[in-house]
Amino acid sequence: MKKKILILLLLAAAGFQSHVFAQEFQFMVNLNYDQLVGSQKTDPQSMTQLQTYMNDFLNNQRWTSDVFKKEEKIKCKLNISLTRSPAVGNYEGNAQLVISRPVFNSNYETVLFTYVDKNFSFTYLPTTQLYFNENNYTEELPYILAYYANIALIFDYDSFSKLGGTPYVQKAFNLANLARNSSANKRAWDSNGDSRNRYWLIENLNSPQFLPFREGMYSYYRQGLDVATQNPVTTRTKVLDFLTTIKEVAQLRPNSVVVNSFFDAKSDELLRIMMEANPEEKRKAYAILSNLDPTKTQFYQKLAM
């Protein structure tokens, strides 16, 4: 009897531990390699293994010390398109990271951030074990994935508490610095590369000039979208306040990757929310949106009618 009780207690403890240490993410990695089909350097089976590796790495790693219930996992999509394989095991392409969050008291899921990475290159061989050490650059692919994971944590945590993502800003910044010094892909990690590359994304998020943007995310989501069902007027006020904040940030740092990527993700949502506003609020929203997101001026024109 004592043995049975002990076994039951051990099983219960194991189950409890599994629940408590549930991983943070529900990442879905989609790998498109259609442009590589037929290449002697590309084996379809290795592509399947690569996609599995990326999903497992992102979903099974422990990224925080916090407790996540299954329904609290952060939903992310990583859409990767491989366009070149200059040598066996070497791949080049682009990636799109999409971070989502549920809106309280609704069935609506909002996109927190969309980031397009045009300098996605790495080495992968199914027979080679990839190692990750956050304090020592090891391999390109796990470092890219860890960087993305921390970017996702920044936006998710900032949306639930003011500057809640700060610990992950520092982690992503450290990863980027290590990669910048060691990676062969300078276009992705170096300050002299593309102005929307990984260096500039985390530079923005780490800059004091962007603190109002990060603080505003809490107001936009937690005090705005999350109360839309009960108080849509408050939601519109918070959204307009955040747009004003973004305008002030953009004056200090024009054409930044954070602001541009924000509008890539939010234009539909912003228009939908502000279409219910009063005429004066609509005019203010249109003036800001058409100025900060000029390629979609015609799209926002409905607010000016």
Regions found by a protein language model. Name each.
Residues 161-255:
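Flexible, glycine-rich surface segments
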Residues 24-92, 103-105:
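Start-of-domain marker
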Residues 41-49, 139-144, 257:
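Soluble non-cytosolic domains of exported or imported proteins
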Residues 1-26:
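Bacterial Sec-dependent N-terminal signal peptides
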